[in-house]
Amino acid sequence: MASETETFAFQAEINQLLSLIINTFYSNKEIFLRELISNSSDALDKIRFESLTDKSKLDAQPELFIHIVPDKASNTLSIIDSGVGMTKSDLVNNLGTIARSGTKEFMEALAAGADVSMIGQFGVGFYSAYLVAERVVVTTKHNDDEQYVWESQAGGSFTVTRDTSGEQLGRGTKITLYLKDDQLEYLEERRLKDLVKKHSEFISYPISLWTEKTTEKEISDDEDEEEKKDAEEGKVEDVDEEKEEKEKKKKKIKEVSHEWNVMNKQKPIWLRKPEEITKEEYAAFYKSLTNDWEEHLAVKHFSVEGQLEFKAILFVPKRAPFDLFDTRKKQNNIKLYVRRVFIMDNCEELIPEWLSFVKGIVDSEDLPLNISREMLQQNKILKVIRKNLVKKCVELFFEIAENKEDYNKFYEAFSKNLKLGIHEDSTNRTKIAELLRYHSTKSGDELTSLKDYVTRMKEGQSEIYYITGESKKAVENSPFLEKLKKKGYEVLYMVDAIDEYAVGQLKEFEGKKLVSATKEGLKLDESEDEKKRQEELKEKFEGLCKVIKEVLGDKVEKVVVSDRVVDSPCCLVTGEYGWTANMERIMKAQALRDSSMAGYMSSKKTMEINPENAIMDELRKRADADKNDKSVKDLVMLLFETALLTSGFSLEDPNTFGTRIHRMLKLGLSIDEDESAEADADMPPLEDDAGESKMEEVD
């Protein structure tokens, strides 16, 4: 009975991806086999996990295997597994109508010059079959459904048919590739064996190749008589009897037989001793584990024995994955095995979020085989394993730090993770702090560690100074650094958004308190003369401070004479426990922020004025002469808004600020106000002409 065939269109992005794969020249097409074997291994993991709680799941096919069958007669290569299989809806959704988030991202990565071998990292490895095949047929049987056949030549559509007449799989999936004429090398036994060794040697299920074996069999002429009879007829030869006797004994014929040949006989690499494993073997294992096309940066292979037993191999990649901090995706970087049986990946309880970039495997002797995700959360053994893994990861980072070049690569890729670790991991905070690196006022183009900073501290210096901001360029000429630089103190530039969170938790390093250059309460060592001079200036400018506070009202909490600004007229500092300007910027950028919290944390600004600055001195004279002078009010507003910008805050009303600047330009250029009165109808008034002439003087 012929089954009905349904035709489906490929989802648009998948169609695009297929035409990219088919129409672009890629030199390393061989990765298709790695991807298909990797998918088979995942399907086998799933059925093995299901069978831990329900043994009957394996009834249809008790053996777990991957078979590879090259057929030179039909130019097809088949990859068969006894994994979980797919239902009809799985087939339709997973192979064509629903694009994974990785589809688009993979195409963007390809366009940016990435290697096609990255395909597996984006979850679309199946489509790599079209690198070598013009037609792909997928036959699959799931325990909960009948057997179905998926077929496509990638011409925009695929068909799905119920399979009533084909060979019954029992359970699992068979992918048959009809190879392109120029890709027939993938039917050669030697080539397939090399590829499995290169990419899939460490898959934990037997991968068997259907091989042709030719044997020479010795048989006597009598046995061979029947076969040869027809051929011998009519052939007359004069042979000597003795020779004939010899021939009879030594007759050989070639016999062709087929057999399965297991290609990955290695025992799991983590069960071997680290000293016996070569760098190349670790690299091959890492690649097969992660689908990465590059080698790892560093590896840690260890076992823990005693009350608790487990073995683990941890790898640090060379670069961060494209979706490292995508919270919607569970990172599946550590695979959990129990007594060599794969249990699950993306086990969140095994490693904290800040280490989500570390990849590897853990094989426990003590966990129960039928452990569920729910049980994992309460499991004491797992908590101990996790603690050990974190400790070993930190050790591994210190090992990487011994090589400056490697550590620079590592830090560029994963510094955010270390800073997240400072924020989240109170146990290891002081250790992680030693791994941090920053630019500073004295480090030039190099990065410096907190340890190195401490060794360079001035005599009598008891605090570590830092400034946070949007970029190195934005902070290196900040008014907050003027006094610190003048006195020769080194200041660390913390210009990563996550630094704000990290430094909030890292209060001190080696007993030295971390102090922000942008918050109030910055105390610098001063001589008696400096202190005396400061007191005099405070007294002298007290009146101006009051006037400025009256003009600005609740825009600032208070106005004080500064001892941190040397050249700039003024700056705005935040309370010791409030948000810095940079933190305010970060919080404003968060779509789901709590605005009531923002109001509370960000309203405490103190204006610090520089008594040594000519503008401030002139302003003081005017305020002393007439505290109701209208030009003073305008100048104070302009100085406040400029200070907002130079101190790293954003302007609430940039238009008014712009208008003030334009007004100043007109005054400077002696443009008559009446000429452009219409254009400036909406501008806040600069009051009267007397004010204008006074402003000109200041300018």
From Swiss-Prot:
SMART domains: HATPase_c. Expressed in callus. ATP binds at residues 35, 39, 81, 86, 94, 101-102, 121-126, 173, 373. Gene3D superfamilies: 3.30.230.80, 3.40.50.11260, Heat shock protein 90, C-terminal domain, Histidine kinase-like ATPase, C-terminal domain. SUPFAM superfamilies: ATPase domain of HSP90 chaperone/DNA topoisomerase II/histidine kinase (SSF55874), HSP90 C-terminal domain (SSF110942), Ribosomal protein S5 domain 2-like (SSF54211). Residues 215-250, 674-699 are annotated as: Disordered. Transmembrane segments: none annotated. Molecular chaperone that promotes the maturation, structural maintenance and proper regulation of specific target proteins involved for instance in cell cycle control and signal transduction. Undergoes a functional cycle that is linked to its ATPase activity. This cycle probably induces conformational changes in the client proteins, thereby causing their activation. Interacts dynamically with various co-chaperones that modulate its substrate recognition, ATPase cycle and chaperone function. The TPR repeat-binding motif mediates interaction with TPR repeat-containing proteins. This is Heat shock protein 81-3. The gene is HSP81-3.
